[in-house]
Amino acid sequence: MSLTNEKIVEAIAEKSIMEVMELVKAIEDKFGVSAAAPVMVSGSAAAAAPVEEQTEFTVTLKEAGAKKVEVIKAVRAVTGLGLKEAKDLTEAGGILKEAVSKEEAEKVKKELEAAGATVEVK
């Protein structure tokens, strides 16, 4: 009796997971092989894990600096907040813009730094 690949697959499909695991172990022992997926060897670790470029940035006001009034005006212009909200944000510091493009983040940072603020882009 000749076993075809199809018959072998059908026989394996009828087995439980534990029985299949025992079968795999027996095949590994018999033929001296491993059922582990082959690992590709790369030239460098950096090439193996490509770095994703950040696309969304957060602009955070760290410090208002000496020109507080100018910074409040800049915060209002950038965020669209009212005078009181802009003043509170300027005094406390915090996130000005979230999930903005790199260009937008750099523009906001430039405007606020021109007004005298310390700004961080993450």
Swiss-Prot record:
A GO BP entry: translation
Pfam families xrefs: Ribosomal_L12, Ribosomal_L12_N
UniProt KW Isomerase keyword: no
Keyword Ribonucleoprotein: yes
One GO MF term attached to the UniProt entry: mRNA binding
InterPro entries assigned: Ribosomal_bL12 (IPR000206), Ribosomal_bL12_C (IPR013823), Ribosomal_bL12_C/ClpS-like (IPR014719), Ribosomal_bL12_oligo (IPR008932), Ribosomal_bL12_oligo_N_sf (IPR036235)
Keywords in alphabetical order: Ribonucleoprotein, Ribosomal protein
Top-rank taxon, per record: Bacteria
One annotated Gene Ontology cellular component of this protein: cytosolic large ribosomal subunit
Protein task: Forms part of the ribosomal stalk which helps the ribosome interact with GTP-bound translation factors. Is thus essential for accurate translation.
PANTHER family on file: 39S RIBOSOMAL PROTEIN L12, LARGE RIBOSOMAL SUBUNIT PROTEIN BL12M
Quaternary structure annotation from Swiss-Prot or TrEMBL: Homodimer. Part of the ribosomal stalk of the 50S ribosomal subunit. Forms a multimeric L10(L12)X complex, where L10 forms an elongated spine to which 2 to 4 L12 dimers bind in a sequential fashion. Binds GTP-bound translation factors.
Family named by the database record: Belongs to the bacterial ribosomal protein bL12 family.
Name this protein carries in UniProt: Large ribosomal subunit protein bL12
Organism encoding this protein: Xylella fastidiosa (strain 9a5c)
Lineage: Bacteria, Pseudomonadati, Pseudomonadota, Gammaproteobacteria, Lysobacterales
Gene: rplL
